[in-house]
């Protein structure tokens, strides 16, 4: 029995998983990845702007990120934003492009990043559980309003729980992949 609530819940939970994937993309592992820069905002003519909106980001080598700003006057601001970020990257500017060398992670930094990934996963599990609670409340209101019988209520709640379990398991899988990626030397 698929109710409209179940479809909406699945969409919300898929959105939560997508947000977690984005979050994990911003946590750097030992390799260069253009997503690492997604959270950095550059003061571009007084407006906080994502780097990917003021320049092209490429990965020419496994440990090198290259930013080619479309407006060369923004280079200094891009460098400043990267240097002030918590990524631990040192930008070098040759007048045309900004190169970022992604250093190998120390064991301590790896553990720190794994902890950060674990914390993010836990926050997203809470979001999934909150979505479950909201869906169950809607289902109970439908039963009180006479739209569902008691048996249908139980089936609908069981379906919500199955979906919740599936998405929590997916978060655990994503976390273990990310931790493996981070801890890889």
From Swiss-Prot:
Belongs to the RRF family. Its main location: cytoplasm. The gene is frr. The keyword Cytoplasm applies. It comes from the Bacteria. Gene3D superfamilies: 3.30.1360.40, Ribosome-recycling factor (1.10.132.20). Pfam families: RRF (PF01765). InterPro entries: Ribosome_recyc_fac, Ribosome_recyc_fac_dom, RRF_sf. It is found in: Cytoplasm. Disulfide bonds: none annotated. It comes from Clostridioides difficile (strain 630). Keywords: Cytoplasm, Protein biosynthesis. One of its GO terms (molecular function) is ribosomal large subunit binding. This is Ribosome-recycling factor. Responsible for the release of ribosomes from messenger RNA at the termination of protein biosynthesis. May increase the efficiency of translation by recycling ribosomes from one round of translation to another. One of its GO terms (cellular component) is cytoplasm. GO terms for biological process: translational termination.
